[in-house]
Amino acid sequence: MAQMSMTVEKSIKADVTVSHDRVKRAYVTFLAGNKDYWMGVVGLAKGLRKVKSAYPLVVAILPDVPEEHRQILLAQGCIIREIEPVYPPENKTGYSMAYYVINYSKLRIWEFVEYEKMIYLDGDIQVFSNIDHLFDTPRGYLYAVKDCFCEISWSKTPQFKIGYCQQCPEKVTWPVESLGSPPPVYFNAGMLVFEPNLLTYEDLLRVVQITTPTYFAEQDFLNEYFTDIYKPIPSTYNLVMAMLWRHPEHIDLDQISVIHYCANGSKPWRFDETEEHMDREDIKMLVKKWWDIYEDSSLDYKNFVETESKLSPINATLASKESVGDVLISLAPSAA
């Protein structure tokens, strides 16, 4: 009996240790306003559960997110962190999309130093296989996927106009004679593996105030700021929709872990088949896959915890307590 008791005690301690480690790592996303983007965050939370991620989802929200939407996210097991907006200097040239200006507020996530490492995912992303292993990447770097210059949002850039894309640089040679040196490697900021750090956070806020805003807002800024420590990772971790019709030879959807529904009309909760390329069968299939996850009630936080508790009571109890505790702690606003 004594030996059995000791074995159980060791098992409990092991589970407690795992739970303790979990709070040092988390996924994080960003939400602003009172529109329907909360649906994307709910879909992401349920997608992470479906692939059995071991880590929670933190939602950095601006004060203008309605209480109703906050309660929906809490009910889905999300950890809410209210943050204050970050406003860059005035932009006299304009952004690719007018709403991009609010995305500078994402810089606040570097302040979340209760976590040693985080994976940022935009709210229009879905995870179709477990990517927890990215938390084990070597420290000291920022990891992200190289962007595709073939999206329509790049239409005003030289890259788009000449058909050059860093995803397939061999297709179109960069004309050094007329355009000078090719552009540096450039990542899509919809998915980032990063390490929160107060010194970095304070410097980000300082530098952004003396940096002239450019076309892609915070994405341009982050690319410039982290150019020395950026490490590319495969596009399977952030497949932007344009890759499907621009570089199909490089895509095997069965091997893709993360889909970024960023093309015009592609967001599943407001899907518009009349937009260019949205009548493609592969796009419709990916939209359906998102809805299958969103509408799966077994992936709702309450139902998921109840199911897991039957399979592993100790882990389920720890996970439930961990989320509740973090929610209570993290309701205080975060601001510099």
UniProtKB/Swiss-Prot annotation:
Naturally occurring in which organism (per UniProt): Arabidopsis thaliana (Mouse-ear cress)
Catalytic activity entry: myo-inositol + UDP-alpha-D-galactose = alpha-D-galactosyl-(1->3)-1D-myo-inositol + UDP + H(+)
Superkingdom assignment: Eukaryota
Protein name: Galactinol synthase 6
EC number: 2.4.1.123
Keywords assigned by UniProt, alphabetized: Carbohydrate metabolism, Cytoplasm, Galactose metabolism, Glycosyltransferase, Manganese, Metal-binding, Transferase
Keyword check for Cytoplasm: yes
Record function comment: Galactinol synthase involved in the biosynthesis of raffinose family oligosaccharides (RFOs) that function as osmoprotectants. May promote plant stress tolerance.
GO biological process, one term: galactose metabolic process
EC category name: transferase
GO function terms (MF aspect): inositol 3-alpha-galactosyltransferase activity; metal ion binding
Cofactors required: a divalent metal cation
Compartmental location: Cytoplasm
PANTHER family the record matches: GLYCOGENIN SUBFAMILY MEMBER
Binding site for Mn(2+): D122, D124, H260
Record-linked SUPFAM superfamilies: Nucleotide-diphospho-sugar transferases
Active site as annotated: K106
Any Gene Ontology CC annotation: cytoplasm
Coiled coil: none
Similarity annotation: Belongs to the glycosyltransferase 8 family. Galactosyltransferase subfamily.
